[in-house]
Amino acid sequence: MIKQLLQTDDSKTTIIIRLMVGAVFLSEGIQKFLLPTIRGAGRFEKIGLPNPEFLGSFVGAFEIISGILILLGLATRLAAIPTLIIMLVAIATTKSEVLQNEGFWSMMHGSRTDWSMLLGSIYLIIRGGGKWSLDRNLTGQRTTFGV
């Protein structure tokens, strides 16, 4: 079962999505600890989420761990599941008010990064880490570094 979760295709371009998604989540997670009043607990309190102190640290830790795993291509599918959930919650909690008050186009403009990360996470869950990932090495799939 673990081998099936780590199994990936031979796609050479998956690394682009993996690096983008991993870097964004790693950066966002670090910011939740470095700037808690504007990126972590303070932000969660402002939008009305319960227990913002715990939630800020919890989400930040998941973003850091998932971001690192995705960057490495290690347990990529599993690491992308928390990022998918984080993005669904982020869109539902922060963008629904914008949609209601400012309209569809303002909401779409304000959530373009959220949608990109959501779709990137879905892609990684479906495809895995790609040709240049630790997942591929751990499953014994042969990786060549030629183009």
Question: Across the structure, where does each feature detected by a protein language model lie?
Answer:
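Membrane-interface interhelical connector segments
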Residues: L34-N51
